[in-house]
Amino acid sequence: MARNKIALIGSGMIGGTLAHLAGLKELGDVVLFDIAEGTPQGKGLDIAESSPVDGFDAKFTGANDYVAIEGADVVIVTAGVPRKPGMSRDDLLGINLKVMEQVGAGIKKYAPEAFVICITNPLDAMVWALQKFSGLPAHKVVGMAGVLDSARFRYFLSEEFNVSVEDVTAFVLGGHGDSMVPLARYSTVAGIPLPDLVKMGWTSQDKLDKIIQRTRDGGAEIVGLLKTGSAFYAPAASAIQVAESYLKDKKRVLPVAAQLSGQYGVKDMYVGVPTVIGANGVERIIEIDLDKDEKAQFDKSVASVAGLCEACIGIAPSLK
C-alpha cells in the first residue's frame, strides 16, 4: 500500500516542524515546497538524516515548483510573512493574500483532491480566500486555529490547577485573533466544568478571567518573547493533529476554522467552531448553545472576521 503524500507549502519554522512531526508519526511521505531555493531541500535532507535515529520510514523531498505537490492527500499551508513584534495578524493581510492566490492556483492545478489545512495569518480571512482561489469544496479546506487556541487554554488551566493537560478539555470559538471566545462553561477538568471549579474554590473568577485573556494574547506573548518570529512548535503540532484525524479517519472532535452555512447564524464565512474531522474532511459542524454574553462575544468575533474578508475583496475583487 502506497504511503500518504503530505505537501507542506512554506518551509519556514512551522513548515520544518510539520515535516519532522509527520515523519515521527509516520503519516506519510513529505514534500516541502518553498520559493526559496535550497531551503526545502536542506530541511528535507536534514529531517531524512534523523530518520535512522528516530526509526521512521518516510521520504522527504524539497521543491521549488508546485508540480512536486501533485496528487497530495493533505496540503498544509504556512507560506506567507510571519508576525513580528508590534504587528497584528491583520497587518499581514495584503502581503499574505497575494501568497494565498498563488498557493490556491498551485493546489487547484496539482492537488485538487487534497484535504487542505491553512495556518497562514490572518487565519480566518486567509483560509476563506484560499478556498475561493483553489476552488476546492469547503469541507476539504479548514483553518488551523481552534486546536492551537484550545491547547493554549488547556495548558494554562493545567498550570493553574496543577493537573495533567490530558485531563483538561477546552473549547475556543470564533476568529483566531484578539476577539476569540474561550468558553469557560464548556471547558472542564476531569469532566468538571470550570464554573463549578470556581465554586469549589479551586480557583477564582479573577484568575480564570486572566487565563482567558492570556489565551487571547497567546500568540502575541510568544512574538514578544522571540522578537524575531512567531510560534511554530504548537501551531505545527495542532495542524498535524487535524491532518492525522483526516488521514486515519479518526473522527476527532476538533475546533477548526470551517465554512459555516447557517450554523451560529453565519453563512459563507470561515469561523472557528467544533467539528468532526474524518476521511471526508469536515464531516459535521457541532452547533453548541451559547448564552447571551457568549453569543455577543461570538458575534463580535464574526464581525471582526467579516471586516477582514471585506478588506480582502477590496484588494482582490475576484473573491466577491
UniProtKB/Swiss-Prot annotation:
One GO MF term? L-malate dehydrogenase (NAD+) activity
- Keyword NAD set for record: yes
Q: What is its EC number?
A: 1.1.1.37
Where does this protein come from, organism-wise? Brucella suis (strain ATCC 23445 / NCTC 10510)
What the record says about family reads: Belongs to the LDH/MDH superfamily. MDH type 3 family.
UniProt: substrate binding residues: R83, R89, N121, R152
Q: Which reaction does it catalyse?
A: (S)-malate + NAD(+) = oxaloacetate + NADH + H(+)
- List UniProt keywords, sorted A-Z: NAD, Oxidoreductase, Tricarboxylic acid cycle
- The keyword NAD is annotated on this UniProt entry: yes
Locate the residues binding NAD(+). Answer: G10, S11, G12, M13, I14, G15, D34, N96, I119, T120, N121
Q: Where is the active site?
A: H176
Quote the protein name from its UniProt record: Malate dehydrogenase
Q: Which PANTHER family match?
A: L-2-HYDROXYCARBOXYLATE DEHYDROGENASE (NAD(P)(+)), L-LACTATE DEHYDROGENASE
Q: Which NCBIfam families match?
A: MalateDH_bact, PRK06223.1
- Indicate the enzyme's highest-level EC class: oxidoreductase
Q: CDD domains from the xrefs? A: LDH-like_MDH
Spell out the InterPro entries in the cross-references.
Answer: L-lactate/malate_DH (IPR001557), Lactate/malate_DH_C (IPR022383), Lactate/malate_DH_N (IPR001236), Lactate_DH/Glyco_Ohase_4_C (IPR015955), Malate_DH_type3 (IPR011275), NAD(P)-bd_dom_sf (IPR036291)
Question: Which GO biological process annotations does it have?
Answer: lactate metabolic process; tricarboxylic acid cycle
Its biological purpose: Catalyzes the reversible oxidation of malate to oxaloacetate.
